[in-house]
Every structure is written in C-alpha cells, then in structure tokens.
Amino acid sequence: MPINCCLIEIRDEIDLAKKENFESHCWNDIVPAEDYVTYAPYVRETYIGKAPALLVIDLYNLVYKGGARPPHEITAKFPSTCGIYAHNAIKPTQSLISACRTGGLPIYYICGTYSPKRVQSTQRSVSPITEDDYDVHEAFAPSPEDIVFRKERASAFFGTPLIAHLTQKGINSLIICGESTSGCVRASVLDAYSYGFHISIVEECVFDRSILTHKVNLFDMHHKYADVMKLDEVLAHLKGLFV
C-alpha cells in the first residue's frame, strides 16, 4: 500500500501535511508502509532548541581516503573510508558550520585519537594509520574559538569533558553532523538523549559507508531520540534564532 494511503488511514489529531513532512526523508524508499502505521504515534513537529550548539563528529582525514568512489570499491585498501558518501556531504556540512559560526553558536569538533597502541574491542580490519589521519579534514578546519575534543570510543561524551562544557554554557539543544550514522553519530545521539538534550540531526550532513545502514538508523533515531531535519529547514530555524 502506498505511504500516502497509509498516512490518510491513520490520521488522528495530527494533520496529514505534518505527517507527510515528518516522514519526507531519505528512508522513504526502504521503509515498508506498515512501519509508518506502527510509528504514527511518534509524529511531531521538529525544531531547533533555543540554546543550541553544533557537534561535528569524526570528520577526520581517514574517512575521505580513496576519493569520491563507492565504498565497496576502495574499502579493501581503505577500511575506514566512507567514500562518495563522505564527499557528498562536504558542501552541505560546510554550509551548516558556516551558518552556526555566523550565528555565534558554540561548535565542538569531536575526533578519534591517534595511538599506535590503541586497544581494539573487535578484530575488524583496520588500515595502517598516521597521526594526521585523525586530524579534522581541511574542508572543515576549526576556527580558534571552536573546541576540539579527542575520544577513544564511539560516543562524543564517553571519556571527554563535553557534558561539562555544555552544562556550563547552558546548552539545551544539539545540532549534529558527521559520521558514521550507525556508529559514532548514533552513540552520541543516544548519550545526548540520555542527558536530556534536544537533538537535531541534519540529514545531508551525516553519512555512513552503507547507505542501507544510514537510512535505517536515521529512521530509527528520528522516531525515538532525535529530530532528523533537512539542511534548509535547519538553516531557516537558525535564522529565526538569530533575529
């Protein structure tokens, strides 16, 4: 059954236009119609909180190695790359960072830590790394006023002073971009949700090495833990905050 038909059938207090807008995202081509019925009670208005900060998660050089090619063509040589999905997100992410910087929002860069003796929790394949592999990619160079934290595990909060900084600054809302959608982004979203922050994930500014994993995780987080929003929508909300 078409998605629109399902939406009409499950109409309640929330008008149809709001439902269609809430579900108008990249996952529409993979989510079965019955799942929209199951998750209908989660439909709501999305927004950016009044005291937001931007989290830029794991946009380091290692992710872009091998160039703008499908990951399956290059992961044998570059296991950590997200290939074309990483490169496609560069311009939208630059626009997001620029808008947040113009508006004076606190910007936190969270990146992995280089260590040749880093302890791995799994036996998955990893490529040989150098110290600059975990540096922020030049397309997103931090400004002097931005804050950069290093982490050794998936979440931006685990083993970092991030929560203390956010609390001290009175931040109540987080805008999130970076990678990977199913890994470090998701781990950070769940921790942020657990700490009580309102979370907005910018759809065009997060990515994964698997498009299926990317879409499924966005769908799941959107209905449970965060507002997945289009870049244009986020920029419009930010302009409203800056007026």
Where are these regions (language model features)?
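A short acidic, glycine-rich active-site loop
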Residues: 76-91, 126-131
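Acidic-leg catalytic submotif of subtilisin-like serine proteases
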Residues: 52-65
